[in-house]
Amino acid sequence: MRYLAIDLGAKRTGLAAGDDVVRLVQPVEVIDVPRGPALAEALARAVERHGPDALVIGLPLNMDGSEGAAAAEVRAFGATIAARTGLAVHFHDERLSSFEADQRMARTGRTHREKKQLRDALAACAILEAYLAETG
């Protein structure tokens, strides 16, 4: 099954693609659109471009593992995307995914601007890699 992972942000949303056969995950793009109807449309177009079978959306849990207001907002947005695309949406813990993305970029020699742009897509990679590892 092919997945498109989504790391939702207030200003930018990172996307990563991968599958559960070879378990290769790669960053594919960053969408520079604030969350809302315009982002839902941009994600629907990204789904058409990348052709996933399902979506994995990072769920912002509290550090104790509980769900707060941010998680409820992401779940509601996920329901919108599911209705718009007709794809199954899976949610996965995104705690520390941005930290992991920063660690991956720490020694790459990229400029601050390049790192800032790539960070969200690498966070989506971390979310999808963890999801695939957990689901078998």
Residue ranges and their predicted role:
Residues 2-6, 10-136:
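Phosphate- and other anionic-substrate recognition elements at nucleic-acid/protein interfaces
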